Amino acid sequence: MALTLMKGSEAIAEAAIRAGARFFFGYPITPQTEIPEYMSARMPEIGGCFLQAESEVAAINMVYGAAGTGARVITSSSSLGVSLKQEGISYCAGAMVPAVIINVMRGGPGLGNIQASQGDYFQGVKGGGNGDYHLLTFAPASVQEAIDLMMIAYDKAEKYRIPVLFLADGIIAQMMEPVELPEMVDYKVDPEKKPWACTGWKPGDDPAKRGVINSIYIDTESLAIHNDELQAMYKEVVANEQMWESYNCENADYIITAFGTVARVAKSAIAQLKEQGINVGLVRPITVWPFPYDAVREACTQPSVKAVLDVELNEGQMLEDVKLAINGAKPVDFFGHCGSQMPSTDEIVAKILSMKEGK
């Protein structure tokens, strides 16, 4: 298939359409505004629905309603906009409504800036809204990977009835890369495969099949039972849906852990260090929830590994999960920046050399 040069945000939007999304609800905010801009033109072309909501809060509740019918629905925002969506995201998780949410992360906290960041890891992975819930959370490192993950996102969301979150950063959204676009999925809502969906109820129909979707359980025992069902589902996701990349890890002297675009910078640093005779590997979680604890532990606790370096475009958020995985078996150091200053290849090389010298 031919390659097409596309901006990341537009490629993500097109991939969602090709995966069967026919409803987009959102609100403009930099650096993801190209997603709703693209959808505003593309959705009408394929008979879909684009609606610019009056706010992020309204947009996520529109997602809740439309996804409750069994349709494939998507919304996107950036950081503080996703913060505004958290109540509705918790509703979707609590009601087990599958949907796709894109967070093109920007600098923070507060208004921050409009440059790239990975500062929303805690929000995405640990649960930004209220209650005990998780989102299946992807952290793509390239435009092509974002496309490929989008093509499986709805299938995973519907299999488990779980919202899917993309933790992308402003670099992926704004960069242009050659990509291979998949064929269009012929998706139609099948009530037999989605008996939970609200597909309409008329007088005379069986009341038991009218389909009520909600996340409120006034009776304490009912809420406890529902939460037990959620936790059982999350265990299935943890068991079956972990994704990661191991790069040059066998017999490595040092292991770098990183996610998203930072991992690409880390690979450049690994190449430079190899020229200096230092063997460095990389473990890159592709799903940050569920986090691939076993894979990280296996790579980082090899006898050859002297220490682990976690590199992020924040002040050390995934670092906590890396430390949990390693559990004190190896020293773990951190290098990162806030303020949207991407760690450079030279900085990562210098940090590894410093660790080698025991500094």
Could you describe each region identified by the protein language model?
Residues 1-127, 134, 142, 338, ...:
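Thiamine diphosphate
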Residues 7-11, 232-254, 267:
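Glycine-/acidic-rich phosphate or pyrophosphate-binding loops and their flanking alpha/beta elements
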Residues 100-105, 138-140, 165-169, 312, ...:
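Short beta-strand segments
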Residues 115-170:
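Conserved thiamine diphosphate
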Residues 161-246:
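Conformationally flexible catalytic loops at phosphate/diphosphate-handling active centers
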Residues 266-299:
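Generic long, charged, amphipathic alpha-helical segments
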Residues 312-359:
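Peripheral docking tails and interdomain loops at the edges
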